[in-house]
Amino acid sequence: IFYFMNFCLLTLYLFPGSLLGCFFYNDCKIQPQITRDLVISSNHFYVFFLISFVGFLTFFEDKKVKLLFIYLIFLSIALEALHIVIPERTYQWSDLFGNLFGVIVVIFFHYLNKKYEFFKK
């Protein structure tokens, strides 16, 4: 599931315009909004939280989890930076912070769980 989610994420992120907007609204310039944005982009937070959580469940060994979190942080920065050169897309700080915050929340809960063992194996 994690690899499929990565493929979907890359497809949605690198498509010039909004693939979901094309599907739902028949207009590739409209981006569907799940909830209202606050300081960060809520859509980006939800996506990166979900992919981080699924990744954590997929790779729960310590060495793999560390590599996973490095990968996800790099991915969240790289994908948003690519919006600078993709037509119909724009780089936005709120999107980048939404990406990073989604990953960081899962990292935080992972280390809390590791320290206090809420969920024993």
Question: Which residues are covered by each model-predicted region?
Answer:
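Bulky hydrophobic segments
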Residues: 1-96, 100, 104-121
